[in-house]
Amino acid sequence: MVLSSQNKKAIEELGNLIKANAEAWGADALARLFELHPQTKTYFSKFSGFEACNEQVKKHGKRVMNALADATHHLDNLHLHLEDLARKHGENLLVDPHNFHLFADCIVVTLAVNLQAFTPVTHCAVDKFLELVAYELSSCYR
């Protein structure tokens, strides 16, 4: 999948908004994932709850969104930028790579709910970006 210059511009602009709202948006997206796909809770057995208000959900959601925000500044070299995360999720945590796509869908919904200007252009750019991120995070499985 190739990001156009228009896609890259939209994603880079979105990166700052994601960073500024990392905890709230990350918790929301993660809570959506747990509600829609309860099987994903198995990777978080130490969590005391799975709602967006749970401190563990907030902390992990913030970590994920900050990683995504950082990735928006490395669009031309996502593979190298996400290599350590891919290894961690693939070799240590043994996360089913399909879950990256499930989570991406939840992130799109969270962004659409929270961004007033979530235009079709932005939606397309975000979909492409998250698809590339999911692909790179799955690289240790190939």
UniProtKB/Swiss-Prot annotation:
Residues where O2 binds? H60
Name-wise, this protein is Hemoglobin subunit alpha
Extract the InterPro entries matched here.
Globin, Globin-like_sf, Globin/Proto, Hemoglobin_a-typ, Hemoglobin_oxygen_transport
Q: What is the lineage of its organism?
A: Eukaryota, Metazoa, Chordata, Craniata, Vertebrata
PROSITE patterns membership = GLOBIN (PS01033)
Residues annotated as domain Globin: 2-142
Described function: Involved in oxygen transport from gills to the various peripheral tissues.
Q: In which tissues is it expressed?
A: Red blood cells.
Q: Which residues are noted in the entry as heme b-binding? A: H89
Keywords noted in UniProt: Heme, Iron, Metal-binding, Oxygen transport, Transport
Entry keyword annotation includes Metal-binding: yes
Q: Which GO terms describe its molecular function?
A: haptoglobin binding; heme binding; metal ion binding; organic acid binding; oxygen binding; oxygen carrier activity; peroxidase activity
State the signal peptide span.
none
Q: Name one GO cellular component term.
A: blood microparticle
- For this chain's UniProt record, which GO biological process terms are given? hydrogen peroxide catabolic process
Oligomeric state and interaction partners are given as:
Heterotetramer of two alpha chains and two beta chains.
- Keyword hit for Hydrolase: no
Similarity annotation: Belongs to the globin family.
